[in-house]
Curated annotation (Swiss-Prot):
It is found in: Cytoplasm. This is tRNA threonylcarbamoyladenosine biosynthesis protein TsaB. One of its GO terms (biological process) is tRNA threonylcarbamoyladenosine modification. The lineage of its organism: Bacteria, Pseudomonadati, Pseudomonadota, Gammaproteobacteria, Enterobacterales. It comes from Buchnera aphidicola subsp. Acyrthosiphon pisum (strain APS) (Acyrthosiphon pisum symbiotic bacterium). The keyword Cytoplasm applies.
Amino acid sequence: MSNIILSIESSLDCCSVAIYKNEYIHSLSEKCKKKHTTHILPMIKEILSQTKTEFKELNYVSFSKGPGNFTSIRIAASIAQSLSISLKIPIISVSTLAIMAEKTFRKYKQKDVIVAIHAKKKQVYWAKYTRNKNSIWIGEYTESLLEKKIIQEKIENLKKRWTLVSDQSELIEFQNILNVKKNYVFLPNAKDIIPFVLLKIKNKNKSFSIENNINYLYNQF
């Protein structure tokens, strides 16, 4: 029997959960700005019910580690850690920006992706990710918090054309740069955490701790 994986995503203004079971991904998603606390646990119970899964059957738990809002990331991290400890199962965290890159590939088959998340004032958290032939996203080392004008300069200096994705339409202002061929606005989804977890399981890269593994952006709430 294949592994059963629970994933949780609550880093921005949307809550989502997913279950990987019998090689199929089941997911739920809701917009829940400032109300993550009241949404996440009921959604987890609902997805378990829909998939006829009990907590004790879970083999792995995973969550989005940010960047994102302090409070909402902490909620997902705390739930994931509690499940990891109580069930004695590994916990795996994935970058929010990488999750958005994976969603871009799932929906649009784009492999060279610039991800931009609004931070505050004129700052943006950004990264450029490339999916290689082994389905691995390379680019977490590029994640940084920068001024918009600096990001524009970086994009203009890239040697190939990229797809731009963001959580807010105002950041699509970068679309007029010649190196940007397509642009999309959306929020991350828990179902796009699953491919990362499957790769880490395959490579035997797993952990039972979240220490030094969370990337807080700022406390919006």
